[in-house]
């Protein structure tokens, strides 16, 4: 009999504890009642009720894949004017990054020599001179890019903003493309 009374009392305790636990949690009061929002529903009349982006379909076209390869930051914009280029370079200098110029005759990564791109597959670009440590003039970077273009007219040229404290590349954008 002792066993059955113990079971009965534990069941009774569980039955009594369940409502107490549910009432211990306070209701969430961060949201407003749904009755405060007006609801207007149109009757369902077939396919006309399906969601549609309507006239915005023309905005969702992707870039053509032939002849318009894209690179890093800013490559989806038109070619930068000299003023825009100076502003971008001033931005990276203002952030304390070291400007560095790189060029490549390939411009695009390929997998001709191995399953993964390597040195001879356009993965690595050649540095033009040394990084411009201590450079505070954006015009000097543009002048170096023009000099690189004069030396290698068929090359892609990019500017890199290098953080020499964290030792990472922070920004990279194309400044010259071959004609």
UniProtKB/Swiss-Prot annotation:
Its main location: plastid. Signal peptide: none annotated. Keywords: Calvin cycle, Carbon dioxide fixation, Chloroplast, Photorespiration, Photosynthesis, Plastid, Transit peptide. GO terms for biological process: photorespiration; reductive pentose-phosphate cycle. The keyword Nucleus does not apply. Belongs to the RuBisCO small chain family. RuBisCO catalyzes two reactions: the carboxylation of D-ribulose 1,5-bisphosphate, the primary event in carbon dioxide fixation, as well as the oxidative fragmentation of the pentose substrate. Both reactions occur simultaneously and in competition at the same active site. Although the small subunit is not catalytic it is essential for maximal activity. Heterohexadecamer of 8 large and 8 small subunits. It comes from the Eukaryota. It is found in: Plastid, Chloroplast. GO terms for molecular function: ribulose-bisphosphate carboxylase activity. This is Ribulose bisphosphate carboxylase small subunit, chloroplastic 1/4. The basic functional RuBisCO is composed of a large chain homodimer in a 'head-to-tail' conformation. In form I RuBisCO this homodimer is arranged in a barrel-like tetramer with the small subunits forming a tetrameric 'cap' on each end of the 'barrel'. It comes from Fritillaria agrestis (Stinkbells). The keyword Cell inner membrane does not apply. Residues 1-58 form a transit peptide. Coiled coil: none annotated. GO terms for cellular component: chloroplast.
